[in-house]
């Protein structure tokens, strides 16, 4: 193990000088061995020449000073993997932060790993039922696929994510890994208690690097979570990997990139944006041994889906769930836009003709209603043809029927959560399209589970 000295500190970036014949490699982990911050880990990012390496601190650099001794561990950051991590909260270095004693792991893996080779990768067309009507109908998830939840500030990404975790993790008997990347600590805390109350905590590994952490932690915490998920996958399991929020991973990369002195590219993002995203996303894949199904929340800055960060993420996903501020403002939750959301699985050969035609029928009616809105706003409903009036009436029922009470939002809505099976979802929307419920008031369809509940509600009106 070679030893060096701290020569310069600029925020989270620390330069360390080593003897010329013992310069650490890029991504090696270095440790501070003296002073107030003894044990602080630095990750090598660049070799500057003359024995000096530029590193990112995996913790606060307040209290660091020049001249401190640094030792090279000779390997990348190693984190605990395996069943011992289940039910525990860890930080980017895999250290427990839940005050429940040591992890007691039997195995540690480096967070920097190669993506599986083409020959090892596998694809599945098996659907993953979520119990959320709008998702199962319009943008069904594939087992072992990648899903993005796109939305601006405050339209419900985290609530949707928590509902998906609750529905899938409880219905799905496998293991899950949750990586909290640069989000609010309060949400991490809520999530822990939600899992505990649902009795699924012993099947979930939690890794947090939240908003208040230095950029190094936020940049690497997604890899820590992913490494734990890869271990479960390589043991032959089907794993769920949740990331909240991919945008903060990009943002941490932007901060680090600026500190490392790289020239920014479009909108101030790092020039290596596509590569950084690719390095993470290419590892989230299913192999012949097991599968990783990943669900990622993606913050959309200023509701602009063409922003480089969400636009780069789109390319890697199998299904995109787009949350709309317009739908949220109408009080329809989940505020998922059925016209903007899409999935590769929505194909008659995969989901079957009935499901495909029902989903496309719903989208056609909603699209027609969208076109008629201008006419209604200027001339009023009376000027529409009978056929268009019927379309508008059905579209408004469909819109309301796409809403659903969530289990994780029971505290806010006051109504118990509902899980709707795919079969019931298709039957309900098929009935509305066929005109079976034309005589029912549209309010009856708002915030209900299955269609029977809507009929029951209509009878009471």
UniProtKB/Swiss-Prot annotation:
Origin superkingdom: Bacteria
Protein topology in the membrane: Peripheral membrane protein
Compartment annotation: Cell inner membrane
Family matches, as Gene3D superfamilies: 2.40.10.170, Bovine Mitochondrial F1-atpase, Atp Synthase Beta Chain, Chain D, domain 3, P-loop containing nucleotide triphosphate hydrolases
An example molecular function term from Gene Ontology annotations: ATP binding
Alphabetical list of InterPro entries matching this protein: AAA+_ATPase, ATP-synt_VA_C, ATP_synth_F1_bsu, ATPase_a/bsu_AS, ATPase_alpha/beta_chains, ATPase_F1/V1/A1_a/bsu_N, ATPase_F1/V1/A1_a/bsu_N_sf, ATPase_F1/V1/A1_a/bsu_nucl-bd
Pfam family, any one: ATP-synt_ab_N
Entry binding sites for ATP: 151-158
SMART domains named in the record: AAA
GO CC entries: plasma membrane; proton-transporting ATP synthase complex
Record field: catalytic activity: ATP + H2O + 4 H(+)(in) = ADP + phosphate + 5 H(+)(out)
The enzyme's E.C. designation: 7.1.2.2
Keywords: ATP synthesis, ATP-binding, Cell inner membrane, Cell membrane, CF(1), Hydrogen ion transport, Ion transport, Membrane, Nucleotide-binding, Translocase, Transport
HAMAP family per record: ATP_synth_beta_bact (MF_01347)
Similarity comment: family membership: Belongs to the ATPase alpha/beta chains family.
Purpose of the protein: Produces ATP from ADP in the presence of a proton gradient across the membrane. The catalytic sites are hosted primarily by the beta subunits.
Quaternary structure note: F-type ATPases have 2 components, CF(1) - the catalytic core - and CF(0) - the membrane proton channel. CF(1) has five subunits: alpha(3), beta(3), gamma(1), delta(1), epsilon(1). CF(0) has three main subunits: a(1), b(2) and c(9-12). The alpha and beta chains form an alternating ring which encloses part of the gamma chain. CF(1) is attached to CF(0) by a central stalk formed by the gamma and epsilon chains, while a peripheral stalk is formed by the delta and b chains.
Protein name in the entry: ATP synthase subunit beta
Lineage of producing organism: Bacteria, Pseudomonadati, Pseudomonadota, Gammaproteobacteria, Alteromonadales
Originating gene: atpD
